[in-house]
Every structure is written in structure tokens, then in C-alpha cells.
Amino acid sequence: MQATKEVITSLENAGLDLICDGELYRFDTSHPETNGMIEYFIGPMEGIRGELDAEELAAYQEKKGMGFRTKPPGIVHDAIKTGSLDLASPCKRLKDLATKPVKFTMTGPHMLSKTVANSYYGSTEEIAMAFADVLAGQAAQLNADVIQIDEANLPGHPDESEWALRAINRVLDAIPTTGAVHLCFGNYAGKRVQSGTWD
């Protein structure tokens, strides 16, 4: 809480108009590959198991585009449900601590669907739509001035944009305030993890 408070104060003192919380509470040193961008969201959800057997792990390590992770954040083994995911509480904390308008961020359904292993759904698109349903339910409860969906994997996979946009739009449609989408190439710790284009 103190670190979050310091981030907010620093941003306000710097004169920013829209304040975020820095996401420091999401970081897990056990999973530095994605700075808490994945595990924070899927860990509390139902239908995803954290431990994989040797065969499941080997299959994941063959998955194209996941070389930046040593193991998946989990394997989908049943229908994805909200579980104990609670984005409203950290959003409220941000709103309570800030004196200016705030932006709350959440990892998007495409990114989440690309990083998990799967033994339940028929396609990555189906996984993305299941994540979109959970995230839409969470987004509907948020009172931030701007709610941003972070999609760090999509620019490297433009061939998936059609179904990714359906999932992203499902979340955007649930946002009661202003929605935004942030695309990037996932440049964690100065290491580019995929190639792509902004075209």
C-alpha cells in the first residue's frame, strides 16, 4: 500500500492528468517473466490449475511464441470462471488515494489466452472469450475514469486480430466509463520477446 501511495503521489507531483497505481502489488518474484501481468489475473480464477505434469509442461514448451516463459502460468482444465478475482478493491484503493482522475489497467483476454496451457477448450479463441467474460464482469464493477486493457501479445500475432478484437470488445462493452486499449511488443526487462509491425 505504501509503495502504491508513493507511485500515485509521484505521478501527481509530476503533473500528470491521469493517474495509475503503478501495479506494484501485482508483481510476483516467482514469475518475473511478465511482471505480474498474467499470474495476478488468472491465479484467483476457477478452471485453471497452477501445476502441470511433465507431459503438459513439455507440450507447452513446444508452443510457438512462448520462449520468454519457462513454464505457463497455469493450465485450463475446466470452464474459466471468476473465482476470487477482485479488481474492484485495488481500483477503489487507487481512486481513494488519488486526487486526480485515475486509470486502472487489466491484462486483456488475448494475452491471457496466449500464455496459458489448455486441456479444456477447443481453441485459443474459445479461451480468450472465456477470459473476456470474466474480465467484462470485473470491468463492469470498476469506477476508474479510464479502464485500460493491456494487450502485449497481439502486435506479434496480427493474424489473430479478428477473434482477438471480438474478445477485447466484449470487455470494452462492459466498461461503465471510458475504455482504452494499450498494444505493445512485450519488451520485458529490455528483451524483445516477439516481432511484429504496427501496420
Please provide the spans of the model-predicted regions.
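Domain-level signal for soluble alpha/beta catalytic cores
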Residues: 1-199
